[in-house]
Amino acid sequence: MKRNTTHNLTVAAMLSAVAFILMFIEFPIPMLIPSFVKMDFSDLPALLGAFALGPVYGVVISFMKNLLHIVVKGTSTACVGELCNFMLGAVFSAVAGFIYKHHKSRKTAILGAAAGAAAMALFSVPSNYFITYPAYVEFYHMPLEAILGMYQAILPSADSLMKCLVIFNLPFTLVKGLLDAVLCMVIYKPLSPILHGRK
């Protein structure tokens, strides 16, 4: 038991470090969503951890990733951005890991990852509406109208924040989660000996 716990903590620490590094590898998707919303794959290590170690470890990896980001890079939004990033990643990995934990097979891994991506996408709407975007307005002194203008440059009929989040952010977050899921399915088996401590 002690060996398993030590191994799990070691793997979780390693995956947290990888997730932290992946946060810096981000890129915009021009013409599809405003450039301040960027694509990255930093939730992938948490998904790997949730499958290999359990859903709790997936949540821990999401938390540690953002804690490292605050410590190393600092925060310009009083940690609000990191909080929302953590919550979305935690929902993704927890849902996926919980489904996979009760019947471990490739089918339930795919189902869990897809369900986690969907849950994360749905949760992104209220978290952005009530937390993230009000923080942008407060800390960056950016009027809400300016934010809406970035969306309207792509779709002029996007005339409210809720509409913008449903039309743009929700599908973007879903695709982001599904891409993480696909990558996880591709690399999980080759990484399995490391993740599970097998030779």
Sequence positions of predicted segments:
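Loop-helix junctions at membrane interfaces
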Residues: 1-199
